[in-house]
C-alpha cells in the first residue's frame, strides 16, 4: 500500500463514516450472540470412517491423500460427502455463487441437515452482494444449519462506501477453501463453489486442484476451521439483516431452491444411490497415497494487523532452506514482492 493512498484514506475516511452513519440502511450487529462450537470428536464412530479404517490401520500415523484434478470428480466428491454425512458438515469458502452448482450443493446440504447432520458454513463477505444476506439468512434458519460471514463490511446497503471507510480492516479476506465430513474426510484446494470451478460453463476453462484426504490430517483441517469459526471476525448471518426471515420466508426460499435445482440442466449426472456413493469413496480410498502431512493456515487475527510475514511465508522459506533436490508447488497465484523474489532466486541458484 503506497503512502499516497494512506493519506487519501485518512482524509476521506471521516467523511465516509459520517455519510454511512447518517444513511438509513442495514448495518452489521457486532454484538449479535455467538455460541462457540467445535468439530465432531468421534469420527471413528461413523460409517464413512469405517470405510477407510482398514487402510488407515496399515499406515499408522500417516494420512491418505488423493489429488482430484477434474471439475466433475471434484464436485461429485463434495456431493458424495454431503449425501453420506452422518454427524457434521463444515464448509469454508471465499466464494459461494448462487448459480446452478451453488444451488445444487446447497440443496444437498439442506437434505443432510434434514437428516440431523449439523452444518456449519463460513463464507467470506467480499462477494455477499444484493439480496444474498436475506437468502442465506433463510437457509441459516434451519435448526441444524448455522452460517457465518467472515469480516463483513458494516453497512450492507452502501457496501462500496463502507469498504472504502474501513479499508484497513476489510482488505483482509479469507481465501480458505475446505469441505469436511464427520471430521473423517476432508477436501481442500483451489476451488470455490460455482459453475466455473467444476467444468459446467462452456465459456470458462478454470484449472484447479483439490486434495481429498483422511487420517490424522483431517483433524488439523477441522482445527483450522474451528479457529476461524470461533474468531471475533466470523459474524452470524443473522447479524447482517434488519429483520430475520420468517418460517414462511424460509420454506418459500427452500422450495424455490429445490425447483431451480430440479429445473436446471447439468453436463454430467449428479444423482447417485448410496451404494454408488460408497463405491466412489472406496475407489478413491484404494488409490490413496499414504504420507505424513501438515496444515498451514494464517491466523484470523491478521485482520487486525499489518504484519508482512505470515505463517505460510515462514513455512515456505523453511522448506526452501531444507530442500536437497526439488520442491513442487501448485498455486493459482504466486505473486512475490521483490525482496521475496530475490530470496527464492538465491535458493534456486544454491542448487
Give residue ranges: language-model regions.
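Charged, low-complexity intrinsically disordered terminal segments
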Residues: 24-175, 181-351
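Short, low-complexity, charge-dense intrinsically disordered segments
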Residues: 1-15
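Bacterial N-terminal signal peptides
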Residues: 13-23
